[in-house]
């Protein structure tokens, strides 16, 4: 990559995210303002057939909006990447707030030769020691295994294309397969796929509120004993169902 001009594309998959997207875009706008002058940044919101005001919110904040009808998160991420013009890609969830340091660290890492990576995560509301312990366990596993959380994944655009993007064979867990694929390719090229040592991004804890502990346990056990569950839409309801949808 050139040591001079650099373009970053931030891709936000969004399905009915009118309640969360404004805060995410506000945090992103602040972060973009802190980037060096030689770094350009485009924001792409992928409207996944929303029925609320997601599209109008994104347009009002100056984002490029593209439409993807298929309800499969990997396809939505890939659609955004296909429209992106950047040297580097950041996949950011619509309910996740970032700091200026996240984008500057990503740009610095990619320009220094990183293949890609992720960041630690936090939630805006946790209740009790069990939830806090679960979060700490994930962040430790993420760093040890080099698995990026889906709410914030970044990569060189050329390497994203080289691994074929996110696997569209699955409905959930695509970020783990993506992390593994990029890590393998990075090793062959003498690069690294790394979880950055930086402050966590902050995601909504809505799934903790929406679903009961026993439902979380079912999801965990399903994927623990049946790792291929992500290939079946019925078994990935946790990522696609919202209680108020009925």
Predicted segments, located by residue:
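Short, well-formed alpha-helical segments that are part of the catalytic scaffolds
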Residues: 17-33
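Cell-envelope/extracellular polymer assembly enzymes that use nucleotide-activated donors
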Residues: 7-9, 42, 177
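Conserved donor NDP-sugar-binding/catalytic core segment of glycosyltransferases
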Residues: 100-129
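A short, conserved alpha-helix in the catalytic core of glycosyltransferases
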Residues: 159-163, 169-190, 194
């Amino acid at each position: 990559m050139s040591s001079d001009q650099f373009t970053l594309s931030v891709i936000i998959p969004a399905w009915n995210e009118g309640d969360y997207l404004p805060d995410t875009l506000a945090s992103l706008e602040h972060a973009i303002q802190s980037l060096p002058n030689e770094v350009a940044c485009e924001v792409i919101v992928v409207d996944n057939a929303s029925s609320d005001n997601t599209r109008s919110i994104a347009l009002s904040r100056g984002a490029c909006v593209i439409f993807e009808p298929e309800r499969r998160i990997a396809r939505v991420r890939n659609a955004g990447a296909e429209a992106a013009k950047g040297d580097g890609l950041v996949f950011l969830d619509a309910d996740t707030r970032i700091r200026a340091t996240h984008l500057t660290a990503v740009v610095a890492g990619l320009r220094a030769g990183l293949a890609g990576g992720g960041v630690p995560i936090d939630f805006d509301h946790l209740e009790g020691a069990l939830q806090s312990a679960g979060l700490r366990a994930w962040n430790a596993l993420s760093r040890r295994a080099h698995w990026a959380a889906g709410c914030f994944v970044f990569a060189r655009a050329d390497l994203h294309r080289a691994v074929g993007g996110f696997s569209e064979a699955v409905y959930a867990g695509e970020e783990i397969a993506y992390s593994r694929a990029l890590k393998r390719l990075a090793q062959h090229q003498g690069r690294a796929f790394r979880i950055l040592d930086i402050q966590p991004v902050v995601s909504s804890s809505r799934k903790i509120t929406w679903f009961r502990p026993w439902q979380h346990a079912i999801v965990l056990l399903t994927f623990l004993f049946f790792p291929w569950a992500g290939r079946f839409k019925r078994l990935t309801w946790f990522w696609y169902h919202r209680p108020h949808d009925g």
